Amino acid sequence: MPKQKAPRKQLKSYKLKHINKSIQEGDAVLMRSSEPGKPSYVARVEAIETDARGSHAKVRVRWYYRPEESIGGRRQFHGAKEVFLSDHFDFQSADTIEGKCKVHSFSSYTKLDSVGNDDFFCRFEYNSTTGAFDPDRVTVFCKCEMPYNPDDLMVQCEECSEWFHPSCIGTTIEEAKKPDNFYCEECSPQQQNLHNSNSTSNNRDAKVNGKRSLEVTKSKNKHTKRPG
């Protein structure tokens, strides 16, 4: 009669001796890439288990994908530290964990005073099979009608509260950083003098309340499935 395998123990936390840190369910971690020279994978710990003696720890992880691993690849509005929470789960040896990291919400990330090497942000969930995103649309800004990339400086119009990239309004980053009040072309005093107050008000309401958005999912031209 074949020997039955001993049941594995489910743990809420586990001490990783090789990095001298403890992990628990819900932690974001950096995991060793299977491809030399590639950056560490980012994952969320969903479960931890060991054998009956408390050895050979494994973690069930939910992978975060980088934009370049998705259908459509990296796009202009994707931040350098942006990741997508995928529907791809795996069991991995706990020994492949290289450290802990922090995956912030998009709102929290934009409020950070400084961004460390272990800081990331997530604003989309990603279906690794279909390439669909949730949400599938995102608000756009500026003349270029692009979603906000937290790596790129933007300036806000004092009148209509719209945001603009310096390059899109014909100025430099240095000029945009000056404390002077900024007015976009439509809200500038010169432009307002060409319209009566009623038409100016209508234009402003249309700009602020238009809720312009961009569809995130792109036509299929690239798809990288995380190995494992």
From Swiss-Prot:
Effect of inactivating the gene: In antisense plants, dwarf phenotype characterized by stunted axis, dark-green leaves, compact rosette structure, less small leaves, fewer flowers and seeds, and associated with a delayed development and late flowering. In shl-2, acceleration of flowering, especially in short-days (SD), associated with a shorter adult vegetative phase. Other developmental defects include premature senescence, smaller leaves and siliques. Higher H3K9K14 acetylation in the genomic region of the SOC1 locus.
Function: Chromatin remodeling factor that binds to methylated histone (e.g. H3K4me2/3) to prevent their acetylation (e.g. H3K9K14Ac), likely by recruiting histone deacetylase (HDAC) complexes, and thus regulate the transcription of target genes. Required during development and for fertility, probably by modulating developmental gene expression. Promotes development speed, but at fitness cost. Involved in the chromatin-mediated repression of floral initiation and controls genes regulating flowering.
GO MF annotation, one: transcription cis-regulatory region binding
Domain of life: Eukaryota
Compartment(s) where it occurs, according to its Swiss-Prot or TrEMBL record: Nucleus
InterPro entries named among the record's database cross-references: BAH_dom, BAH_sf, Zinc_finger_PHD-type_CS, Znf_FYVE_PHD, Znf_PHD, Znf_PHD-finger, Znf_RING/FYVE/PHD
Family as reported in the entry's similarity comment: Belongs to the SHL1/EBS protein family.
Motif Nuclear localization signal: where in chain: 210-217
UniProt feature, compositional bias: Polar residues: 191-203
Pfam families named in the record: BAH (PF01426), PHD (PF00628)
Residue ranges covered by zinc fingers (PHD-type): 139-190
Principal subcellular localization: nucleus
Protein name (database record): Chromatin remodeling protein SHL
Keywords associated with the record: Chromatin regulator, Flowering, Metal-binding, Nucleus, Transcription, Transcription regulation, Zinc, Zinc-finger
Gene Ontology cellular component annotations, sorted alphabetically: nucleus
PANTHER family in the cross-refs: OS08G0421900 PROTEIN
Effect of residue 163 to A: Impaired H3K4me2/3 binding
Domain BAH: 21-137
